[in-house]
Amino acid sequence: MKDVKITVVRKTEHKDLSAIYENPIEHTCDLCVGDEYVSTGAQKPSGFCDSAWDCVKSFVQELANGGGNFFDGWMKNPHSAMISCNDGFRPVSFYIESID
């Protein structure tokens, strides 16, 4: 089974949508662009967001098992994926790639 690296490549905040629809919250996502995590054995890396893991885990598991080429050639690197978390107010984009 391969290790899989998860890199935070973009973090966005839709303040206009938050102002209209979201109740105020004290703690928001603390991931930062450039943060890297390594999944070993297709398991959630320590310190990685639980909600984001729910979004990326199927891709991580597939890459860890040697798969890839998602959606018939979607990515330039067939052993990678670009996946975002499902927070509509503060989406975070992750580049996921198998590593040797």
Regions found by a protein language model. Name each.
Residues K2, E13-N23:
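Short, structured beta-strand/loop micro-motifs enriched in basic residues and often containing a Trp
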Residues T12-H14, Q43-P45:
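Short loop/turn segments at secondary-structure transitions that flank enzyme active sites
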Residues D3-T7, E36-V38, S93-S98:
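Ser/Thr- (and often Asn-) enriched beta-sheet segments in non-cytosolic proteins
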Residues K44-C55:
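Short, Lys/Arg- and Gly-enriched loop/turn segments at beta-strand edges
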Residues A19-K44:
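Short, flexible N-terminal segments of the mature chain
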Residues R10-T12, D100:
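Beta-strand elements of well-folded, non-transmembrane domains
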Residues S58-D100:
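Short, compact, well-ordered microdomains
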